[in-house]
Amino acid sequence: MNVYWFQDLKTGHLKQVQALLDQLKKEIELSITTINCSNHESLPDVLPNENQFNGPSILIGAGHDVYSKILQAKKYLKKYTSKDIFSIAVLRPSYKLNSFDLIVAPEHDFRKRRLPKNVILFQGSLASTSHDPVNENKGIIAIGGPSKHYNFDQEILMNQLHYILSVHPKHEFKIFNSRRTPDALNLKLKNEIDNYPNVQFIHLDSSESDTFQDSLNKSSLKFVTPDSSNLVFEALSAKGQTFLIQIERSTYTRIFGAKKIRESMNELVNTKRVGVVSILNKKGGIDISKIENPSLHFEPLAEVEKVSFSIMKFINHQK
């Protein structure tokens, strides 16, 4: 089957679509063509003409900049073929929901909305499932950055990191930053982490950043800042224990941003799917960190497998 992947070059969007296509490849042979929507090329320049078109196709992508391109492409291709063309939006578009054959979206996007019949829901974010055994002596810390969902307090985060490392002296830790991690925090991490012989800070721009997925899959302890839903659900899609790191003061009052990400993180905490590195405010204004462990009874999330199965079921029913 032909796949035309419309891309907006945002890492979180690309990783989720990639995880889904990798899973679909296990079910059906795919020929994938990527289309960079930021290049503003005309559809005839990037899509096959009537002499090149062969077989059914999937038009897929994530992000508001690509959804209109997917619908335009389907209309354009319909002029050249009677073959099936399936338009699939990954994440919830803000318009023309009924124009897509399928919408693959997180549950929190439809908690207070009517659920259209063409929507396939999943929990959190799409990530490849790993059943690799973990190394009980290894840990990973994944750091995001400022977002509209959380007040990213760098001082609190550094205190939390020192606490995590102090109570796990026998684990070998790798700390990874992200594109949103502030430069000042990167500098602090580099300078202060050098004091720990069992810790390595890996900057996003270094060649070793490619080891992130392998480290995530094989680490028994995974500590993640809650500002990045994608990072959290990537961790939960592998074996081991996942912990959210509190990054804002307990007295902080949130006055901006969408509630849905915070509600999603709170649900993970309440169901014990994740542990928490929290801050307790003692009398006298002393902040004390505390680690609460997650339940050990959960298997890795397999949301991408469920979504892939539903997509294949839909496509097969159209034949």
For every predicted segment, state its role:
Residues 5-122:
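Active-site and donor-binding regions of nucleotide-sugar-utilizing enzymes
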Residues 18-24, 72-76, 102, 112, ...:
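Short, aromatic/basic amphipathic alpha-helical patches
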Residues 97-155:
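A nucleotide-sugar donor-handling region in carbohydrate enzymes
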Residues 146-179:
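Conserved catalytic-core segment of nucleotide-activated headgroup transferases in glycan assembly
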Residues 189-231:
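Donor nucleotide-activated moiety binding/catalytic core segment of transferases
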Residues 209-211, 230-231, 242-244, 248-257, ...:
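Short glycine/proline-centered loop/turn elements that form peptide/ligand docking sites
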Residues 217-219, 237-241:
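Conserved donor-binding/catalytic loop of nucleotide-activated donor transferases
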Residues 262-319:
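Leloir-type glycosyltransferase catalytic cores
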